[in-house]
């Protein structure tokens, strides 16, 4: 075996040197002693006594001691026959435009029985540093085909906005629907309702990463993408529940590295969907516990906020590059608790949230998106004349106001009875019912473009006389209020 050495500022790193100095195993971690010049995040090759090999990454360095996390698990590793080789490289993933339409495991290896990927580059999964001054503000809308998102929580290209869900709710179905229907919306002219819907063969792509999902869920996504023709623009990464927990730490980073290549080198507008970030946070907690770190809230590590930011902040747009990365991470809140550390910290980092509601789901309303706690902080830069339609913002505000009042009236009705309500209150109750049954409720394969959704919103707002539509300017009412709802 050839040994090479690289002089470093603090010692010498031995490339190719094999060590048999395993001093301990703790969960997914292996502790080594008497290592010359180990580097933080360096990749190591581990050979077991039976000849099988595994990969790991240096998590911690203390003098000649190194703590390595093993991606494939530590079962079978001992201190007598196991050898560890330090490569001198950080973890890189091969990337190529040919990755579109392919399925990979959580480590980035093809699992669709297709040919190996011919890489056009090898990129560090931690991503490249982006000069903050080179970032451009997210603008223009990504259309999901779902009315409650497109009209009331519009997503800008380059935005990061999570779906807050819980166990038993249809977040997987919503994610698959977004993958089927998502596309770019671009106004070609000022002529009303004239748009270009680019569904992505050329410059729109989706990177989908599933972490800790069961086999049934994985098969659902694969089957849905293949049967509905969206697979050709999707790169799918699957980390199953029976895969090593530690693999969940690298799966979103490999997915985002692929997205960065497609966006910034190939000029594509990439939508990244990450599910389930709660599984990622649990994997982070497991590694932290194995390292015997001081736990933070509910046992999660104190640095989880920073760690989540290294994932979410990779969304955005860069000056001089055509592409963009938009992120929709999906979280399942334990016990429907929005104050749980994972959704709580996610909400601080991201630019809004889309809330999936159990009460709506129990009433057979799909998608059960509750618009009141939902928010898109960058919506204003994605809508309006020249991007969607000039009445978009006013219609959204009026829908929010009327729905909130309708909810208050519904609560009051439960106390005083319907007989005590005014005629105006009854209008809000009528709006509340029709809003949930016609606007929120939408078939899983029912695609509405933004103009169809806006026209449907006007149909609902015409329940009220003009005098009650306080949030819409008179000029906009003159143009849209009396118009035929089918126009």
Curated annotation (Swiss-Prot):
Protein keywords: Hydrogen ion transport, Ion transport, Membrane, Transport, Vacuole
Compartments (UniProt record): Vacuole membrane
GO biological process terms held by the UniProt record: actin filament bundle assembly; actin filament capping; ATP metabolic process; negative regulation of actin filament depolymerization
UniProt-listed CDD domains: ATP-synt_V_A-type_beta_C, ATP-synt_V_A-type_beta_N, V_A-ATPase_B
One MF annotation (Gene Ontology) recorded for this entry: actin filament binding
Pfam families: ATP-synt_ab (PF00006), ATP-synt_ab_N (PF02874), ATP-synt_VA_C (PF22919)
Membrane topology designation: Peripheral membrane protein
Gene Ontology CC: one annotated term: cytosol
Family: Belongs to the ATPase alpha/beta chains family.
Function in brief: Non-catalytic subunit of the peripheral V1 complex of vacuolar ATPase. V-ATPase is responsible for acidifying a variety of intracellular compartments in eukaryotic cells.
Subunit and partners: V-ATPase is a heteromultimeric enzyme composed of a peripheral catalytic V1 complex (components A to H) attached to an integral membrane V0 proton pore complex (components: a, c, c'', d and e).
Protein name: V-type proton ATPase subunit B3
Gene name per UniProt: VHA-B3
């Amino acid at each position: 075996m050839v040994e090479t050495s690289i002089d470093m500022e603090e010692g010498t790193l031995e490339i190719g040197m094999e060590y048999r100095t395993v001093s301990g195993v703790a969960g997914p971690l292996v502790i080594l002693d008497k290592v010359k010049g180990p580097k933080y995040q360096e990749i190591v090759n581990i050979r077991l006594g039976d000849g099988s090999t595994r990969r790991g990454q240096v998590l911690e360095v203390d003098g000649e001691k190194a703590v390595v996390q093993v991606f494939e698990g530590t079962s079978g590793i001992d201190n007598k026959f196991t050898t560890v080789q330090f490569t001198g490289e950080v973890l890189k993933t091969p990337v190529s435009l040919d990755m579109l339409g392919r399925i990979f495991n959580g480590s980035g290896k093809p699992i669709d029985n297709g040919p190996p990927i011919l890489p056009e580059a090898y990129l560090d999964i931690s991503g490249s540093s982006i000069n903050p001054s080179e970032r451009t503000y997210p603008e223009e809308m990504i259309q999901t085909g779902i009315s409650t998102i497109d009209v009331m929580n519009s997503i800008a290209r380059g935005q990061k906005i999570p779906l807050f869900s819980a166990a038993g709710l249809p977040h997987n179905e919503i994610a698959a629907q977004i993958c089927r229907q998502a596309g770019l919306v671009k106004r070609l002219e000022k002529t009303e309702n004239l748009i270009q819907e680019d569904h992505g063969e050329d410059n729109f792509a989706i990177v989908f990463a599933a972490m800790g999902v069961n086999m049934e869920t994985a098969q659902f996504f694969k089957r849905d993408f293949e049967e509905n023709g969206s697979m050709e623009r999707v790169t799918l990464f699957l980390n199953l529940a029976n895969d090593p927990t530690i693999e969940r730490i690298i799966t979103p980073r490999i997915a985002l590295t692929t997205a960065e290549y497609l966006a910034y080198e190939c000029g594509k507008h990439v939508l990244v969907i990450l599910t389930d970030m709660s599984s990622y946070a649990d994997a982070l907690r497991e590694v932290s516990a194995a390292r015997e770190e001081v736990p933070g809230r509910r046992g999660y590590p104190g640095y989880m906020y920073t760690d989540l930011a290294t994932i979410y902040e990779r969304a955005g747009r860069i000056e001089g590059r055509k592409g963009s990365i938009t992120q929709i991470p999906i979280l399942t809140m334990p016990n429907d608790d929005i104050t749980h550390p994972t959704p709580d910290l996610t909400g601080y980092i991201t630019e809004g949230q889309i809330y999936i509601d159990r009460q709506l789901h129990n009433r057979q309303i799909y998608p059960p998106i509750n618009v009141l706690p939902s928010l898109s902080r960058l919506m204003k830069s994605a809508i309006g004349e020249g991007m969607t339609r000039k009445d978009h913002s006013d219609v959204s505000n009026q829908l929010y106001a009327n729905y909130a009042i309708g909810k208050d009236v519904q609560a009051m009705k439960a106390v005083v009875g319907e007989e005590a309500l005014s005629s105006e209150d009854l209008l809000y109750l009528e709006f509340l019912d029709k809003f949930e049954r016609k606007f929120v409720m939408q078939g899983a394969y029912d695609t509405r473009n933004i103009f169809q959704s806006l026209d449907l919103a006007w149909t609902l707002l015409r329940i009220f006389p003009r005098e009650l539509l306080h949030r819409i300017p008179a000029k906009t009412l003159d143009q849209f209020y009396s118009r035929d709802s089918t126009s």
